[in-house]
């Protein structure tokens, strides 16, 4: 069982996934810093408050922290857009690679070639 686990872990997909998760976590920290330190102050200039995370709505005893929710939305939109750009670039690269690789002959192609050779052989006789 341990041997199977080692084989599973050593497969490329699992290692790629692990690297992706680690890079994603680091990237999330960068985006959160971008939102907190650059984007929120810019938005704050227009609404008169620098720190959006402190925006709240008090209804009775309930305190709704919609500013933190806005920060999360901004983080999500930035991360989603960058992931979209990465996927788009990867798809473009993969598509070019597929176009450059000539298609291998199919079974039908081989059968047509055999048929043509047989016709040619019969016409020679």
From Swiss-Prot:
Subcellular location as annotated: Cell membrane
Q: Explain the purpose of this protein.
A: Channel that opens in response to stretch forces in the membrane lipid bilayer. May participate in the regulation of osmotic pressure changes within the cell.
GO CC aspect terms? plasma membrane
Location, primary (coarse class): membrane
- InterPro entries, A to Z: Mechanosensitive_channel_CS, MS_channel, MSC/AndL, MscL_channel
Where, by residue number, does the polypeptide cross the bilayer? 14-34, 67-87
Q: Which PANTHER family match?
A: LARGE-CONDUCTANCE MECHANOSENSITIVE CHANNEL (PTHR30266:SF2), MECHANOSENSITIVE CHANNEL MSCL (PTHR30266)
What does the annotation say about its assembly with partners? Homopentamer.
Q: Which HAMAP family match?
A: MscL
Q: Which family does it belong to?
A: Belongs to the MscL family.
Q: Which GO terms describe its molecular function?
A: mechanosensitive monoatomic ion channel activity
Question: Which Pfam families has this protein been placed in?
Answer: MscL
Presence of keyword Repressor: no
Record-given protein name: Large-conductance mechanosensitive channel
Keywords from UniProt, A to Z, are: Cell membrane, Ion channel, Ion transport, Membrane, Transmembrane, Transmembrane helix, Transport
Q: How does it sit in the membrane?
A: Multi-pass membrane protein
Origin organism is Lactobacillus helveticus (strain DPC 4571)
